[in-house]
Structure formats: C-alpha cells, structure tokens
Amino acid sequence: MDYKHFKGKHANIVIEIISLLEKGVKKAQEILEKPDAGSYTKLENSSGDTPIKADLALDKFLEENFLSLENIKSVFSEEKETPVTKENGSYLIAYDPLDGSSVMEANFLVGTIIGVYEKDYKAQNLVASLYVVFGHKIELVVALEEVYRYAFYQNKFHFIETIVLENKGKIIASGGNQKDFSLGLKKALEGFFAENYRLRYSGSMVADVHHVLIKKGGMFSYPQKKLRKLFEVFPLALIIEKAKGEAFYFDKGVKKRLLEQSVESYHEKSECYLASPHEAQILEKYLKGE
C-alpha cells in the first residue's frame, strides 16, 4: 500500500494499523465466511447485546493483533467491560469488531470500526478513525487530516479517492423506531422525501455511513440513544467531519457537536446525526427548540 497521503504527528500509528489490517483481511474473511458465523452465542456483552460467533472470533483476532503494536498502550473492544492495558505505548484503540452483526445472516454489508485515541478515551483525544467494510469487495476508509478510501485487491489496499462531501446529498439513512421520533424529525424526513431523497437504511451503521460517503452526501440519523460513543459514534463522527460534513446531536433543542460530548462511562450511548451541511441545516431548523 502507498502511504503517501499520511502525514503529521499521528501518521506512523495509522500506517502501522493499516499494515496490520492489510495482513489480517484474509483471516477476517475466513471468520465471516464460516457457515455458523452468524449464529448467536449464549453470552451477553457489556452493552446487554447477544454477540454472534463472528463477533467474538473477530474480537479475539483483532485484540491480539492490536496489542502486538509497540506504540499501543490500551485496546478496548465493544464486546468487553473494560480496556486491556499494557505498560508502554502512547495510543489507545477503541473498536467495534463487527458492526452490523444483526444483519449479517441476511448477507448485508458489515464492518469493523476503529477509533485511535491519545492519552485517554475522550472525544477530544480522538486523533484518527478507520473502518473496513466487508461485502462483495472489501474497502478501507481512513480519516487523519483528510478522508481516504481504499479497495482491497491482490492482498493490498489500493487508493481510490479522497472523500469530500458535497453541500447537499440525495440519500437518507434513518434508523431507530419511527413511532418514537419527535414531531420535528418526522417533518424533516417528510420534507427530504418530498424533495426526492432516497431511503437507504440497512441496519448496519458502518454500511449506511459508507453509503453516504461514497455518494458524497446525505444523512445518517439515529435519534435514540443506542449507539456507543467510543466505539461507533466518535470514530464515524470524525470521518464525517474530516470529509467536510457535520456530526451532531441535540441537547434540549440545541444542536451540538458529537465530538464535544463528554464520556461518563465506557459504554455510554448517544443519539447521532451525520450529514452534509445542507441536511444538517434543514434538520436543525426542524429540531431547534424541541
């Protein structure tokens, strides 16, 4: 892989993680392709969810590999109660080993989300984000100074493009239970669809956000506090912001940046809106004051 795009203080650790992922893709594929990979276990993770077999197998594989990196001090999986910490190192990794696992049996797109933190697990300390999506092809998206997209081919990640969102998109990925949506959100969504926006929601956050990115705009929304800040929300928020979009939530009707949220507990959850500037502006108009 050509690493010419990665510059600055945190470039080296990102390159190390990508190199590790590049070498581990085939093993990850093997885990996902097993006939019983989508079968539910009898366990319960720290968030109260029941993981599938592929969740746990990928988690074990990734944890071992991340801990092998000299400059990684702490590794924290969504599947674990607390981080695994080493004596040395400068960076911390929080990751969701298999986002979208609930739709894997339907053969939908799933992926691994990775946030790279410095010093402590806080939004303000997030220095880079990555995700890998597994489908009929495998792609990697990385956010450092900008957002870069790669495709896996012949055992290597090959650069496709630098992703920059346009001011306005045409797709909406609206997750959550619609009967619980606020009146403002319902009106905003009705307005988008009246303007011929297309609904593109799969139940896999990483897949839906990836769709918004490769289409160069639109909106992903999940108004209920279900998504985990450290493992899903913050890493994908950074990617959207670096792609010139907006990542936000509403606090008593006031729009605020997701990456300015505090973290009171490791598995704390949040509502989440990731959007192009136009969609963010429209949503704020409808939800302001709610």
From Swiss-Prot:
Enzyme class: hydrolase
Cofactor: Mg(2+)
Gene coding for it: fbp
Enzyme Commission code(s) on record: 3.1.3.11
Sites where the protein binds Mg(2+) 1: E78, D96, L98
Binding positions (Mg(2+) 2): D96, D99, E232
Subcellular locations according to the entry: Cytoplasm
GO CC annotations on file: cytosol
Name this polypeptide is given: Fructose-1,6-bisphosphatase class 1
Protein source organism: Helicobacter pylori (strain G27)
Coiled coil regions in record: none
Gene Ontology molecular function: fructose 1,6-bisphosphate 1-phosphatase activity; magnesium ion binding
InterPro entries given in the database record: FBPase_C_dom, FBPase_class-1, FBPase_N, FBPtase, SBPase
Main location, first listed in the record: cytoplasm
Pfam families given in the database record: FBPase (PF00316), FBPase_C (PF18913)
GO biological process: fructose 1,6-bisphosphate metabolic process; fructose 6-phosphate metabolic process; fructose metabolic process; gluconeogenesis; sucrose biosynthetic process
Residues binding substrate: D99, G100, S101, S102, Y201, K226
Cofactor comment text: Binds 2 magnesium ions per subunit.
Domain of life: Bacteria
Pathway the protein contributes to: Carbohydrate biosynthesis; gluconeogenesis
Subunit structure: Homotetramer.
Family designation: Belongs to the FBPase class 1 family.
Catalytic reaction annotation: beta-D-fructose 1,6-bisphosphate + H2O = beta-D-fructose 6-phosphate + phosphate
Keywords: Carbohydrate metabolism, Cytoplasm, Hydrolase, Magnesium, Metal-binding
